[in-house]
């Protein structure tokens, strides 16, 4: 085989690895879990980092804060800087980082709607407000096909199911492509196949959990919710993609790729 043909074959067979970051909702993130995921990112140096949204909570400008003392707390700057620091630490050793829009990050725009004269200010557009371009991160305002046949979404684009993986799978059926998402705070994968005989296709719905500390979520009654902490690791060769879900324990520890992070 000619060397040029061998090189092309090797290029086609190169494994690309993704680290998928679930909902952080800074400042309500699980600090130990996030530190351990950063250790994983630095050790493995993934080719790409995918962020499913809700990286920052924006709790002081939520509709729930209106008319309460929370609306007067001046914490957005600190929350933003902490979010940027965490995202940088998670992606600094990767060639690319993609971030998808989400309902919590939409809170900035929804707040600007109350003062329409400010909407056109470029520095108040969410990607600029967060400085993503300066950090080499790409922001997507709509669902993004990051791999042939696979869409990155937040997960609020359709109806939400209480069963892990089904929210993503319903989006996959709607779009005709497999879906990777967050939003539900659940960790799971579900699949659906359709066709006749040897002519069929399989669709997958993958939900990647969350990286929140539920003790900080004061709105949860008794701190109870059908949530699971986790992240995902993806490996691709050519058009083939294999997802691996990584459950994270309540103390923030987990095992991934043969190593314990604790």
Segments from the language model and where they lie:
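Polar, enzyme-active/binding microenvironments
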Residues: 17, 43-44, 244, 248-260
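Short acidic-hydrophobic surface loop/beta-edge motif
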Residues: 7-12, 141-148, 191-193
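Core catalytic region of metal-dependent phosphoesterases/phosphodiesterases
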Residues: 21-133
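Short acidic low-complexity segments
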Residues: 129-149
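Mobile, glycine- and charge-enriched loop segments
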Residues: 6-31, 185
